[in-house]
Amino acid sequence: DPATAFVAVWQDSSHVTGVDSPQPVVLRGEDASLALELAEEVVFLGLDGERAVFALDLSGLADSEVLDAVGNRGTFQDLRRIGPQLDRADGALLAYARAVLRWHRGHRFCGRCGAPTAAKDGGHVRICTRANCGVSHHPRTDPAVIMLVHDGGEHCVLGRQPRHPSGMHTVLAG
């Protein structure tokens, strides 16, 4: 279906256009064909209205190849850096794509027996390929909380990870 949408992820970076106001690059039809052919993993993210949306993992490509795969449109950016500039729906789409593809990269082998796993159910399950094992692996759904601790006025508590860029602070989570 030419309306089918694909969002690309490369080494945990999201495919976007623009610097000051980044927007996800959504590949469709012929524009998606090379990326789809080269993707290590293709995962169904869901429906946007009646249009299917998939995530493409291009992490196996060299940095000199990845832009060719997406038609030399946009750049790949760290979602933590561009996230605050994205609207809620775009940020959610890119975060979901990144998270599910990261899960796939980390679960290519069965945690029980060590055999390779294969994606099933649109990419939301990985099944052990060893016949006498066959364990189903699912993405983790850990409970988490994000909070804003404030004094009821203008002041709040923010945290900062040493790995984050200078000047980047966040609300607390855990």
Give the predicted meaning of each segment.
Residues 38-40, 105, 123, 142:
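Short connector loops at helix/strand junctions that flank enzyme active sites
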Residues 104-107, 114, 125:
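Residues immediately within or flanking Cys/His clusters that coordinate Zn2+
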Residues 126-170:
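N-terminal strand-loop-strand
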